[in-house]
Amino acid sequence: MELTFASYNIHKAVGLDGRRDPDRIISVLREVDADIIALQEADRRFGARASVLPRALLDDTRWRPLPVAKRPRSLGWHGNALLVRRDIKCLHAEPLDLPTLEPRGAVLAELDLRGEHIRVLGAHLDLSGLRRRDQIKAILKQCTRRGKMPTVIMGDFNQWGRLTGAMQAFGMGWQQITPGASYPSARPIARFDRIIATPDWSYETSGVHHSATSAAASDHLPVWASLRTA
């Protein structure tokens, strides 16, 4: 079974022109056309933490959001949301608290794809770097708690080095896929956005989605990877 996973920090749908334009984000998602998508900064930061992507817009797409929000108007938890193809069955979904000096979290879901069960997580890690390693360890602890399953972790790791610093917390048992430079979208130099997979997956291909729309829609470009269950 081959699936395309994507991670996209949508910057609260505010583009490089300073306009909040959720339609533009939806257009980028359609261009990428992944099966499973992790979004970061999908909710406003203050007040009711309302989603920046109206449900009516999502209803017009091939994806549905998974129930990981703690607030009724939010799409995700601390801005982390998961979208999946409508034919994918959700077995379990939950928000995760992470050790932090600033508001950060992750989201976890277990899915049924025609009898094959997989786990996906979305995360947006600490900007300062002071708790990033602890946050990765907390995510891995939650995976252990839920039991062994083919797993993919996606998100904005805010880490410059591919195998340095906090990324060393993953150890040898994880495939670290860094599709390419995705930040800032106008002239990408940083590889903050990554996809991490257990050895259950066979890596096929990956990339950074760069188009006229994606270059303007957010300060990050979306990244994607095609993986096949081994």
Label the model's feature ranges.
Residues 53-62:
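Glycosyltransferases and closely related glycan-assembly transferases
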